[in-house]
C-alpha cells in the first residue's frame, strides 16, 4: 500500500536530540494472534443490490484443526449480521455473535487430521468501511469497492481475519446485469440469469465467478463492482487488464501502459516469475494512492490522466510499488503487523529500483534521497521507533515513514554490504523458500545468512530492531610535511531513546586533478580517526561516496572545495554543494557557480536548486539567466523560473507570462504563469484570466490558478 508523498529537497537538520512529539512508546504492546485452525478455503457467495446498498451473503468455510479435540471455533464478524450456520450435512450449528466475532459450536470434536466444512449465512446493510457502496457522482459511476486493509475483511465476510493464515478463495457474485464484477484470481465464468426471472419487475442479473486458487491473506481480498470499461492488455500469456470509467478510457491505456514492462522487470529482478493467474488494476474514488490485493490492485482515480499531465503528476512509481507487492506482501506476507516492512519497505525499494532502471542513476538517486528525507522529517518532527515495532493501537499505526522510506534506505545499505549479486540471490531464495507463506523478519535474516554465509544479526539489530539513524560530524586536516590526511568522524546521535552507536562501512572518496581514489573504512566507535598518505592534498573529500548510508552529516568545506564539488561530483554531491554554497552567498564565486549550475547542470533538481539560490541571493542581476531557464526542458525548473519572475511583480514580464501560458506543454507551468500574471498585472488582465479559468486541465490546476490570479488583482 502506498500514499503519494512529497519529495523533500536536501536539508541540513541541525538538531541532534529527537523531538518525540508523538509518544509511540505509550501505545500497547501487541503480539501475534494465536489460532486453533488452518483455514483452507472460503467459498463466498454474494447477492449484491446496489440500489438498496444491501448484501446477502454466505461463506462456506473449509478448515483443518491445528490440534486435536477441536469442538468450537471463532470467526471475525464485524457489522454484518449472521443469520445461520450449517455444517456440510445441512444441520444447524449453534453460535453466538458478540464483540465483533461469531463463536461457533461445531457439535463434534475434530482432530488435526480432519477437515471441517460449514456455511455461514449473513446480511450486510448499508456498509461504509470494509465494503463501500459508492453513489454516482460527476466524477465516478455507481460502484461497490472493498477495502480490507488491514483488518476489514471481517466487515463483509465472516472469516479469520489476520495475516498469519493464508487461504484460497472463491467469489461468486450476483448483480444487476449492467455491472461488471472483479475479484481475485481467475475468472471462472459469467452466467446470465435471465432464465431465473419469474417476475418482470425483477432486474436481469448476472453471476460472476472468480477463483483465487493459490493461498493469500484476507486483507488482500478484493471485490469491485461497477459499470467499468475493461481495457485488455497482456504480458505474453498473462492477462493484464485496466478497469476504468468509460469517460477516461482513452487516457487510461497510456496511464497504465508500462504495467506489463513493470511485471517483467520485477520478475527478472527478483528471480521469481509473476506468481498469479492475471493482474488487474481497478480505479476507485476513495483511494488516495494504491492498495495491493492479490491479482487485483486498487488505485485512486487520479491515476488516469492525459499525456500532458504525466510529466508533473505521473503515478508511475505508485503503479510500480503496487505491482511489487504481488511478490512482497502477496506471495510472501507479514506474519504479524510489526513486520510491516517486509511488505512496504520492499515495495518502496522496488519502486526506487524501477525508477533507476527506467530513468537512470541520477533519477534513482534523487528518488532515494527524497525517501530518506521523508523519514528524517518524521524522525525530527514526530517520533523515532524501530522498524519492527510491537507497540500500536491499530496495525495502520506502523504504516509510516519508518516502514516505507526508512526501510527502503536500510535495504539499500544492506545491498551495498552484501553486494548486488548476493543481495538479489538472497531475495530470490527468500521468495522461493517462503512462497504463499506468512513470514517475519527472522525468516529473512535466516535466508541472508544461508545465502551470503554472513551473520548479519548486527545489521538487523542496529537498523531494524533499534530506532534512529547515524548523525555524524566529519572534520579533516592535512599535514603537508608528512603528506598525511586525517579524517575524524564523531557519531552525535542521541543514544538515550535506544539509538545505537553504529557499526557501519563508509566509502571515502578522494578527488585529485587526474584521478579519484575510494577507500572503505568502518565506523565502530563514537569517535574514529583515519589517516591516509597521498602525494598531494585532495581537491575534495567525499564522505559516503556512493550515497549508501542512512545518515545526517555535517562536513564543512571551503568555498574552493564546494565549487569543485558542484562542478565535478555525482548528482547528490552537486546538489549538496549547491545547498552548502549558501554559507558563502555574499561571494561572487558562489553566485557564479549557481549561475553555471542553473544554466547547464545535467540534472533538473540541481538546476532548480541553483536557480532558487541564485534568485534569493543575487538580486536582480541575473534575471536574464532566469528568463532563459523559463525555457528549460524540465517543467519543474520552468515552474520555478516563472514563479521567481512573477515575484518581481514587473508588468514588463506580462508578455513572457502570456507566451508561456499559451505555449508551454505543462499544466503546472501554465498555472504558474497565470499566478505570475496575477502578481504583476492590473485589472486589464481580468478578461484574459476569466477565459483561462475555463480551460480544462488535470485536477483543474489551470482553472484554480486562474482563480488565484483573479483574487490577487481584486
Give the ranges of each region predicted by the language model:
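A surface-exposed beta-strand-loop module
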Residues: 73, 77-139, 523-537
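Hydrophobic alpha-helical and helix-loop surface patches within well-folded domains
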Residues: 2, 17-19, 210, 241-489, ...
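Amphipathic alpha-helical scaffolding segments comprising HEAT/armadillo-like alpha-solenoid repeats
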Residues: 555-564, 586-599, 619-631, 650-662, ...
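N-terminal, polar/Ser/Thr-rich
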Residues: 18-56, 138-143, 456-462
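Alpha-helix N-cap/helix-start positions at coil->helix boundaries
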Residues: 571-572, 602-605, 620, 635-636, ...
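Non-catalytic accessory/interaction domains
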Residues: 175, 180, 206, 246, ...
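Surface-exposed beta-strand/loop patches in extracellular or lumenal glycoproteins
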Residues: 58-79, 169-176, 442, 492-507
Amino acid at each position: 500500500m502506498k500514499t503519494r508523498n512529497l519529495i523533500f529537497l536536501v536539508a541540513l537538520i541541525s538538531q541532534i536530540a529527537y523531538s518525540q512529539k508523538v509518544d509511540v512508546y505509550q501505545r500497547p504492546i501487541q503480539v501475534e494472534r494465536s489460532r486453533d485452525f488452518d483455514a483452507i478455503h472460503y467459498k463466498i457467495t454474494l447477492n449484491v443490490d446496489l440500489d438498496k446498498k444491501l448484501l446477502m451473503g454466505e461463506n462456506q468455510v473449509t478448515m483443518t484443526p491445528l490440534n486435536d479435540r477441536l469442538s468450537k471455533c471463532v470467526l471475525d464478524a464485524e457489522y454484518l449480521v449472521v443469520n445461520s450456520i450449517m455444517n456440510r450435512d445441512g444441520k444447524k450449528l449453534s453460535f453466538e455473535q458478540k464483540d465483533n466475532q461469531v463463536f461457533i459450536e461445531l457439535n463434534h470434536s475434530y482432530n488435526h487430521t480432519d477437515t471441517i466444512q460449514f456455511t455461514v449465512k449473513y446480511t450486510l446493510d448499508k456498509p461504509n468501511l470494509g465494503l463501500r457502496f459508492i453513489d454516482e457522482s460527476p466524477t465516478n459511476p455507481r460502484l461497490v469497492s472493498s477495502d480490507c486493509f488491514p483488518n476489514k475483511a471481517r466487515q463483509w465476510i465472516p472469516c479469520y481475519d489476520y495475516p498469519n493464515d493464508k487461504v484460497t478463495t472463491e467469489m461468486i457474485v450476483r448483480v444487476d446485469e449492467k455491472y461488471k464484477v472483479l475479484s481475485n484470481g481467475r475468472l471462472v465464468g459469467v452466467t446470465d440469469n435471465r432464465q431465473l426471472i419469474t417476475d418482470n419487475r425483477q432486474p436481469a442479473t448476472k453471476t460472476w465467478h472468480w477463483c483465487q486458487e493459490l493461498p493469500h491473506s484476507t486483507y488482500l481480498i478484493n471485490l469491485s463492482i461497477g459499470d467499468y470499461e475493461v481495457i485488455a492488455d497482456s504480458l505474453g500469456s498473462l492477462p493484464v487488464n485496466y478497469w476504468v470509467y468509460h469517460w477516461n478510457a482513452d487516457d487510461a491505456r497510456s496511464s497504465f501502459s508500462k504495467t506489463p514492462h513493470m511485471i517483467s522487470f520485477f520478475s527478472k529482478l527478483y528471480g521469481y516469475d509473476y506468481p498469479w493467474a492475471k493482474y488487474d488494476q481497478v480505479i476507485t474514488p476513495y483511494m488516495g494512492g494504491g492498495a495491493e490485493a492479490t491479482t487485483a490492485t486498487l488505485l485512486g482515480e487520479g491515476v488516469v490522466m492525459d499525456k500532458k499531465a504525466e510529466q508533473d503528476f505521473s503515478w508511475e512509481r505508485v503503479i510500480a510499488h503496487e505491482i511489487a507487492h504481488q511478490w512482497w506482501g502477496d506471495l510472501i506476507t507479514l506474519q504479524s503487523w510489526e513486520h510491516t516492512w517486509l511488505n512496504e519497505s520492499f515495495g518502496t525499494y522496488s519502486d526506487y529500483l524501477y525508477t533507476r532502471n527506467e530513468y537512470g542513476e541520477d533519477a534513482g538517486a534523487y528518488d532515494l534521497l527524497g525517501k530518506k528525507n521523508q523519514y528524517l522529517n518524521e524522525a525530527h518532527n514526530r517520533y523515532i521507533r524501530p522498524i519492527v515495532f510491537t507497540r500500536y493501537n491499530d496495525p495502520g499505526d506502523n504504516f509510516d515513514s519508518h516502514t516505507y522510506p526508512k526501510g527502503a534506505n536500510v535495504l539499500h545499505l544492506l545491498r551495498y554490504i552484501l553486494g548486488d549479486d548476493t543481495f538479489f540471490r538472497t531475495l530470490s531464495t527468500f521468495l522461493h523458500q517462503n512462497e504463499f507463506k506468512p513470514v517475519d523478519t527472522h525468516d529473512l535474516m535466516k535466508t541472508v545468512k544461508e545465502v551470503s554465509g554472513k551473520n548479519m544479526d548486527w545489521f538487523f539489530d542496529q537498523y531494524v530492531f533499534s530506532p534512529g539513524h547515524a548523525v555524524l560530524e566529519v572534520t579533516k586536516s592535512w599535514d603537508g610535511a608528512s603528506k598525511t590526511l586525517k579524517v575524524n568522524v564523531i557519531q552525535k546521535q542521541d543514544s538515550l531513546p535506544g539509538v545505537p552507536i553504529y557499526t557501519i562501512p563508509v566509502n571515502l572518496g578522494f578527488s585529485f586533478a587526474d584521478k579519484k581514489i575510494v577507500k572503505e573504512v568502518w565506523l565502530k566507535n563514537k569517535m574514529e580517526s583515519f589517516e591516509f598518505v597521498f602525494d598531494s592534498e585532495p581537491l575534495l573529500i567525499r564522505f559516503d561516496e556512493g550515497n549508501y548510508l542512512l545518515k545526517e552529516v555535517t562536513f564543512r568545506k571551503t568555498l574552493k572545495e564546494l565549487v569543485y564539488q558542484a562542478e565535478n561530483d555525482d548528482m547528490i554531491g552537486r546538489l549538496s554543494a549547491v545547498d552548502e554554497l549558501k554559507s558563502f552567498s555574499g561571494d561572487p564565486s558562489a553566485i557564479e557557480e549557481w549561475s553555471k549550475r542553473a544554466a547547464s547542470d545535467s540534472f533538473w533538481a540541481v538546476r532548480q536548486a541553483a536557480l532558487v539560490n541564485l534568485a534569493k541571493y543575487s538580486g536582480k542581476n541575473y534575471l536574464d539567466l532566469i528568463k532563459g531557464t523559463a525555457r528549460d526542458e524540465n517543467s519543474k525548473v520552468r515552474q520555478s523560473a516563472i514563479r521567481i519572475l512573477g515575484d518581481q511583480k514587473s508588468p514588463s514580464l506580462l508578455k513572457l507570462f502570456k507566451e508561456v501560458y499559451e505555449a508551454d506543454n505543462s499544466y503546472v507551468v501554465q498555472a504558474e504563469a497565470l499566478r505570475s500574471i496575477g502578481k504583476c498585472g492590473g485589472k486589464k488582465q481580468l478578461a484574459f484570466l476569466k477565459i483561462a479559468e475555463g480551460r480544462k486541465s488535470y485536477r483543474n490546476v489551470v482553472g484554480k490558478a486562474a482563480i488565484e490570479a483573479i483574487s490577487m488583482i481584486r
